[in-house]
Amino acid sequence: MSFETLNKSFINGKWTGGESGRTEDILNPYDQSVITTASLATGKQLEDAFDIAQKAQKEWAKSTTEDRKAVLQKARGYLHENRDDIIMMIARETGGTIIKSTIELEQTIAILDEAMTYTGELGGVKEVPSDIEGKTNKIYRLPLGVISSISPFNFPMNLSMRSIAPAIALGNSVVHKPDIQTAISGGTIIAKAFEHAGLPAGVLNVMLTDVKEIGDGMLTNPIPRLISFTGSTAVGRHIGEIAGRAFKRMALELGGNNPFAVLSDADVDRAVDAAIFGKFIHQGQICMIINRIIVHQDVYDEFVEKFTARVKQLPYGDQTDPKTVVGPLINERQIEKALEIIEQAKTDGIELAVEGKRVGNVLTPYVFVGADNNSKIAQTELFAPIATIIKAGSDQEAIDMANDTEYGLSSAVFTSDLEKGEKFALQIDSGMTHVNDQSVNDSPNIAFGGNKASGVGRFGNPWVVEEFTVTKWISIQKQYRKYPF
């Protein structure tokens, strides 16, 4: 199926052209070819979408568990039936390899599968004992209302569905704005899937627009009860300021400076395998990506030798070639930012073990070794195929280095002693730590989220149910109650 025609906003069940008079070309990052051209929606259209979503939500909240499950099942079916075409569109739009794009679609479908398991949580009633004679206490779980959802360019379909599916499963409505660079895989394919599934008009509205048109409209509109955002910590702080003033809930997955620690008793070959994947999947453009490789001095030389040898063999180029491992960065701005980081590291005197190069819009891998944990490169979220290896004198120093960052999203540790690995993991101040694995892990039934400057809230069942619903206490006095006056 061709998805290039899905270049309009989806508002109130209709494909609606933007009224701004402005358009945005959606480009293939590898060759800059135009995939399609989107017309951008206005701030007024966004306001209308929130009004529509609010009205639609009141009816959707009355839907049955079976109704919601059926919609999710049909949306899943649409994605599965169009699997190959969707994978190719994700690759073309994001610059992600076929490997990455396949993983992304599989994760998206898994989110829908999991969402079907908790549609019955809505409307659940729990009776709680009362110390007042004749009183019955009931706690109801109700939809939260309208959700404002904003997703990034890197894993657009997965990170969009992570908010949209639970919202719909739990009786909410959604106004969703994908990054315009990945508007199709991050927005309109999802809208098409739910249109196919028979979701009532207005429950999901997908806005193709940009900040120039809508400003902070996704944040300041009084209708949404929760802002779900995945992106930079800087933007997350801005959202926090606005949401805090309005007492809105937030679900924020933000930046990361994720450590990958290799202890003295680690299987170095296994650690290298994990580090190669966890550093270079999607060219390093993932919030959970390995940002610092911290290696115990006893295995440091062996690790560096084996890691750099593997890096030099990674195939790069056109992301739609199934053999490619390292594809293009998303845009020129990201390339320039990466090159600036590289030049600064060179200026700082950090040893370059593998020197990559720019080939068109592809940046081949760079590996810096012997970096200080306080260096600029070690304290910067790289979002590029740049590896930084740091030597640790002891396990405790590795822990201290791992925690020496404002971020706390994901982390990993390699050791042959699993008990020691688990104890190490508990000392890392991050939302997620993986023993004998790399840092890029996700599943729809775990508590996904970060600590410190890496976010607020948790995705994954059952934690997401708490995020996207509200509880209400209703007490029923069944017999006359005596009052003190």
Swiss-Prot record:
Function comment: May contribute to protect cells against stress due to ethanol and related compounds.
Name of the protein: Putative aldehyde dehydrogenase AldY
Residues at the catalytic site: E253, C287
Induction: Activated by SigB in response to stress due to ethanol.
Pfam families reported for this sequence: Aldedh
Keyword field contains NAD: yes
Keyword Membrane in annotation: no
Catalytic activity: an aldehyde + NAD(+) + H2O = a carboxylate + NADH + 2 H(+)
EC number: 1.2.1.3
Loss of function: phenotype: No effect on vanillin degradation.
Residues reported in the UniProt entry to bind NAD(+): G231, S232, T233, A234, V235, G236
Molecular function terms from GO: aldehyde dehydrogenase (NAD+) activity
UniProt keyword terms in alphabetical order: NAD, Oxidoreductase, Stress response
Record Gene3D superfamilies: Aldehyde Dehydrogenase, Chain A, domain 1, Aldehyde Dehydrogenase, Chain A, domain 2
Family: Belongs to the aldehyde dehydrogenase family.
Disulfide bridge partners, by residue number: none
Superkingdom of the organism of origin: Bacteria
